Structure formats: C-alpha cells, structure tokens
Amino acid sequence: MKKRHQRLFLVLGVVAGVSVATALVLNAFRDNMTFFITPSEVMAKSDMPERHFRIGGLVEDGSVERDSDSTQVRFRVTDTEASVPVDFEGILPDLFREGQGVVVEGRITSNGVFKADNVMARHDEDYMPAEAQEALDRVEHSVDEVGDY
C-alpha cells in the first residue's frame, strides 16, 4: 500500500473516531440534561415522559398545605396561565412563600402531580423565571387586546 493511501486511511480513522466520541458525549449530555419549563408547557403536554426536569414559576397564593405530622408540603406552581400541583417531602428553603418565584425539580406522576426532589426559592422577591415572565406578558397582552373591543 502506498504512503498516500495509508495517510488517507489514518485521516479517515481519526475523523471517524472523533465523530463517534462527539456523538457519545452529546448523547450523555442529552440524557443528563434537566429541562426547565413553565406550568403552561407541562399542562400542554398530555404525556410527559418519566424524565427528571424543572418547572419554574410562582407559588400560587393560598395553595400551600403543610402536613403537621411530617415535612410533607403540597402547593401549586403557576405562571398565571396554568398551574401544576407539587408534592414535596423535605425542608423548604427559608425564603419559600406564596407569591414567590420558585423552581422545583423532579418528575410528574401518572396522576398529574409533580413529585419534587428539590425546591429552590429565589432570594430576590422581584425574581421571576424568564419563561414565567414571558407567559405573564402574553397574558397581559391578550387581556389588553380583549379590552380594546
């Protein structure tokens, strides 16, 4: 075999190896990625996969129910268009309260309740996830359009 052919096979082998390695790395990232979506997006998807993901929004006013015998807490996360019931077992952050920006991480159960493994409250009371802010802006915009009639 000529040196030229050997070099060609070497280059092709390196390109194939790099391609396979890149595909494996991207696949690993995709499998470990935690998605951040709004309650409206959760409600729009009828069959949420059994994947671990995050929901961002506000703790709905009047929705927090604490179990007096345990650390079990139930509340709803809303973006004002839709809300998702959340079930959490554990200690909530000190800044957790109704009307506060929150991000919950976990899985949606077959009965539509989000089983949270982690609850993160935002330090700044003016904080709102970007997706939730966009949803609020859409609602305000649609209300303005309806009011123009």
From Swiss-Prot:
Which cell locations does it reside in?
Answer: Cell inner membrane
The record ties this protein, via InterPro entries, to: CcmE, CcmE-like_sf, NA-bd_OB-fold
Mapped to this chain, the residue ranges on the Periplasmic side of the membrane are 29-149
One Gene Ontology CC term in the entry: plasma membrane
**Record's SUPFAM superfamilies?**
Heme chaperone CcmE
The residue ranges for the Cytoplasmic side of the membrane come to 1-7
Q: Name one GO molecular function term.
A: metal ion binding
Q: Cite a single GO BP annotation.
A: cytochrome complex assembly
Q: Which UniProt keywords apply?
A: Cell inner membrane, Cell membrane, Cytochrome c-type biogenesis, Heme, Iron, Membrane, Metal-binding, Signal-anchor, Transmembrane, Transmembrane helix
Q: Which residues form a coiled coil?
A: none
Q: Which residues cross the membrane?
A: 8-28
What is its membrane topology? Answer: Single-pass type II membrane protein
Give the binding site residues for heme: H123, Y127
PANTHER family per UniProt: CYTOCHROME C-TYPE BIOGENESIS PROTEIN CCME HOMOLOG, MITOCHONDRIAL (PTHR34128:SF2)
Q: Which NCBIfam families match?
A: PRK13254.1-1, PRK13254.1-3, PRK13254.1-5
Relate the protein's function as given in its record.
Answer: Heme chaperone required for the biogenesis of c-type cytochromes. Transiently binds heme delivered by CcmC and transfers the heme to apo-cytochromes in a process facilitated by CcmF and CcmH.
Q: Which family does it belong to?
A: Belongs to the CcmE/CycJ family.
Protein name in UniProt: Cytochrome c-type biogenesis protein CcmE
In which organism is this protein found?
Halorhodospira halophila (strain DSM 244 / SL1) (Ectothiorhodospira halophila (strain DSM 244 / SL1))
Lineage of the source organism? Answer: Bacteria, Pseudomonadati, Pseudomonadota, Gammaproteobacteria, Chromatiales
The record's gene field reads ccmE
